[in-house]
Amino acid sequence: MNEIDIRLNQLSYSSLLTLHACPRKFQLDRLQAPREEGDDLSSSVTFAFGHAVGQGIQSAMESKTESQVLMDMFLIWEANLLAENEKQKKSFWSAVIAVQKFMAMRTQGYLEDWELVYIDGKPACELSFLIHMPDGFKLRGFVDAVLRNKLTNEIMVLELKTTSSYAVNSATYKNSAQAIGYSVVLDHLFPELSSYEVLYLIYKTKDKEYEQLQFTKSYFQRALWIRELLLDIEVIKMYEEAGIYPMRGESCYNYFRECEYIYTCMLSTDKLTDSITEEQAQKILQGHDTYQIHITLNDLIVSQLSKGH
């Protein structure tokens, strides 16, 4: 088997979701194939909205003033400031409303027994981690915020989500691999932990209301997660060896929109993508240095065994 393009072995929670839904889309995404541009505006606003709300809530948890919080949101907003996704009720100004609602909840006592964990004098927000897997594969991730109970010293991960749905079903988040991956960060900060809580705080854009879901995660679940991650890597290697990433037609229409590769995915990969340049490869490798927590698969297994799982 030829060496795998470095762009294909840089994994994340979202890229693995794409791999599971449609391997061909995963391949084209990672190799930066050209996309259909029809829905770029709404997609960029949706992406910017989630980041702005997350940043605003993190800043509010740091006890910043409202002016400071809004400035942080403004600085992270990457779409046109006046752009709006009308269908999903997402814009910069609706993000401001979402964060102001959270600040009002805090004033009324929401999470009053919880405080941000600080590491080396910095708040544990947007903590980044990189897991070094076999054959050059890397799994990258971020933790929104780590909280500590002032009374019990219990540790909890705060995970911030937004949705345009009116109803939130717990099954959407209950077995999320993303939340299990957070154990990598908690292992680094609190080696003695045997389980931890994950609090999903979900803002519903159409109702303009928050809903929360809380789950307990154990290190037994992480043992299964490690094995599943290794299986995903083996699947990618198998696709590479076969020279085929299967197309999943059931994923061509999702979230009320056509896949951006709907008219091109059947074409030759060589015609759709360019070979990686030395400059691009170096940029990816240098980007690894920006992650705060690095851990190898061996470290992960040793930690797992020390917890008796």
Regions found by a protein language model. Name each.
Residues 16-63, 126, 258-261:
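Nuclease catalytic cores
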Residues 47, 119-179, 183-190:
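Non-catalytic protein-protein interaction segments used by genome-maintenance enzymes to assemble
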Residues 10-11, 99, 169-172, 184-309:
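Metal-dependent nuclease catalytic regions and adjoining charged, substrate-binding loops involved
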Residues 32, 58-65, 147, 162-165, ...:
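Hydrophobic/aromatic-lined pockets within catalytic cores
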Residues 2-15:
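Short acidic, Pro/Gly- and aromatic-enriched capping/linker segments at domain boundaries
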Residues 23-31, 147, 153-159, 233-237:
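Active-site-adjacent bridging/hinge elements
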